[in-house]
Swiss-Prot record:
This is Small ribosomal subunit protein uS11. HAMAP family: Ribosomal_uS11. One of its GO terms (cellular component) is ribosome. Residues 129-151 are annotated as: Disordered. Belongs to the universal ribosomal protein uS11 family. PANTHER family: 40S RIBOSOMAL PROTEIN S14/30S RIBOSOMAL PROTEIN S11 (PTHR11759). It comes from Procambarus clarkii (Red swamp crayfish).
Length: 151
């Protein structure tokens, strides 16, 4: 038998995802926070909005359905998003916060504020904060009937 040849060592090339940047350089992305009364989405895209970088919801972070929209679930989701963004080299975010809108409520749910605060506390620099809730110019009829919702 012929003598065994030694294993050939393959060089492992470090693959770095995200943009190649210098230290201290600001790399922006857009964070779309959709805060309804049932769930909170924290969705980071590139500046054009076409390419999703990371998307995490409050429902992915908690077990109970009633806690999906809670500030705590939104905070956990935002912390995960910030961690993923930092690993990709993104250190600055423009924020677009959105409520359900249309002929439904135009105020963001309870998780919107805490998601924004969690992103800032996690070390992400905040660029612009914008409310992008869809507001109807003239809408379909709102739920509740002629005499409205009676409490």
């Amino acid at each position: 038998m012929a003598p065994r040849k030694g294993k050939v060592q393959k060089e492992e090339v470090q693959v770095q995802l995200g943009p190649q940047v210098l230290d201290g350089e600001k790399v922006f992305a857009v964070c779309h926070i959709y805060a309804s009364y049932n769930d909170t989405f924290v969705h980071v895209t590139d500046l054009s909005g076409r390419e999703t970088i990371v998307r995490i919801t409050g429902g992915q972070k908690v077990k109970a359905d009633r806690d999906e929209s809670s500030p705590y679930a939104a905070m956990l989701a935002a912390q995960d998003v910030a961690e993923k963004c930092k690993s990709l080299g993104i250190n600055c975010l423009h924020i677009k916060i959105r409520a359900t809108g249309g002929n439904k409520t135009k105020t963001p749910g309870p998780g919107g504020q805490s998601a924004l605060r969690a992103l800032a506390r996690a070390g992400m620099k905040i660029g612009r904060i914008e409310d992008v809730t869809p507001v109807p110019s003239d809408s379909t009829r709102r739920k509740g009937g002629r005499r409205g919702r009676r409490l």
